[in-house]
Amino acid sequence: MIEKEDLLKVARTEMPFGRYRGVSLIDLPEEYLLWFVDRGFPTGKLGELMQLTLEIKINGLEGLVKPLKNDN
């Protein structure tokens, strides 16, 4: 079960490193996330959120998450 808190984090957490530093996880290109499938996601919560982001994108559900970026 996906937790609402995790969806909010996917929408509001920015990538802390690399080419897409400062970009919200939900706005990362799917190809970039797929690169981590081959190379390994970061450990910890960031890696979990990145994997969740990829699942959201693969299933075409970005439209449900993007509005949460600005929802307070």
Predicted features and spans:
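DEDD superfamily 3′-5′ metal-dependent exonuclease/proofreading module
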Residues: M1-N72
